[in-house]
Amino acid sequence: MAAGDFRLCDVVLDDTIGRSTPDVEHERAVAIFDLIEENRFEPLGHSGGPYRLNISLMDSKLVFAIKTEEGGDVATHILSLTPFRRIVKDYFMICESYYEAIRSATPSRIEAIDMGRRGIHNEGSQTLKDRLAGKIEVDFDTARRLFTLVCVLYWRG
C-alpha cells in the first residue's frame, strides 16, 4: 500500500441482482473501465490505497464496501437512496428517449436529448458527491462514473 495512493483499483457491483439490458450492461462496463483508468477516491481517515469497492443495494440503501487492494477492510458506508429516486427516475426516462431517438431522430433532436441526459446525470453526480462528503472524497468525474453504476444497480434492482 502506497501512502497517499487514493484511487480505486477494482470496482464490483452486487451480482446477486442479476443482469440488465445490453445497453445498461454496456454503460456499466464502460463506467467501470473509465473509473479504474482515472479516479480520485479518498476514504477520509485512511492513509492510502489503492482500494477495492463493492457497490450493492441492501434494504433500499446504497452500500459502498471499501477494502484495500490486499483485501483488508477499510470502511462500509450506507447511504439512503431517497435523495436519488427522482433523479434516477428522470435519468431513466430521458435515457429511454435517447435510445429511441438514436434509431430514428434527427441529429439535432438527439443532441438536445443528450444535453438533457447529461444535465440530469450531472445533478445525480453532484448529489452523490455531496452525500459522500465527510466519508469519501471524490472528484466530479469519479462521482459521475459512480453515479452511472448506482443507476445500473437501481435499474437491476
Curated annotation (Swiss-Prot):
It holds the Pfam family UPF0262. Transmembrane segments: none annotated. InterPro entries: UCP032146 (IPR008321). Belongs to the UPF0262 family. This is UPF0262 protein RHE_CH00582. It comes from Rhizobium etli (strain ATCC 51251 / DSM 11541 / JCM 21823 / NBRC 15573 / CFN 42). The lineage of its organism: Bacteria, Pseudomonadati, Pseudomonadota, Alphaproteobacteria, Hyphomicrobiales.
